[in-house]
Design a protein with these regions (language model features):
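N-terminal intrinsically disordered, low-complexity segments enriched in P/E/S/T
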Residues: 1-30, 45-92
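Short, intrinsically disordered low-complexity segments
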Residues: 41-43
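Short glycine-rich substrate-engagement loop in P-loop NTPases that contacts/grips substrate
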Residues: 33-34
């Protein structure tokens, strides 16, 4: 199973997280850097099964928290929809 590890210490602003996701998951240049595009990539582009590991995602300022929660929710929703293909692990 392919494992993608995302550490909160890798970026300052939430918007940067999409670029990290794009790089680590090998997403194409046309990836739209939004939750809908992430869902599309997760369910039709990347090889599965895979595990998404989120390390250190906890207390955030309000802006980062709301923005990051959309991304994390996307990962969790994909896991719920396709439990045989995706696993999300959070390490605080």
């Amino acid at each position: 199973m392919k494992k993608y590890i995302f550490n909160r210490d890798e970026f300052t602003w939430a918007e940067e997280f999409y670029e990290i996701i794009k790089k680590k998951m090998g997403l194409p240049d046309y990836f739209g850097c939004n939750a809908d595009a992430l869902w599309d990539m997760m369910t039709g582009y990347i090889d599965t099964p895979c595990e998404i590991v989120l390390v250190g995602f906890g207390e955030e300022n309000v802006y980062n928290r709301n923005f990051l929660q959309r991304i994390i929710s996307c990962f969790e929703d994909v896991e719920k929809e396709y439990p045989e293909q995706f696993k999300v692990t959070k390490i605080v």
